[in-house]
Amino acid sequence: MGNSSLYSNIYKIVKHIPKGKVATYGQIARLAGIPGNARQVGYALHSLPDESKVPWHRVINQKGRISLDSARSLQHDLLESEGISFDMNDTIDLKKYQWTD
């Protein structure tokens, strides 16, 4: 699968994450048929144009934390605006907020 079709598949999956839920990079990789390639999901989301409608902000790391340094504040604000709360360590409770695919 080429990057273009792989990225399209990743974007399609991410669009299914409902408002108020999150998924992990690894979870998206598994659903995209590339288990163990969480970084590829990160590369795909990083490639999105600014005006994209893909809810990239709903994808976080396996520890329930935001991985992006450059957009950390924006991602945090977007998630909070959807009703997702963070604990004192800036971690999201995956048992409560993780999307069950």
Locations of the language-model features?
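Nucleic acid-binding interface residues in structured DNA/RNA-binding domains
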Residues: 1-101
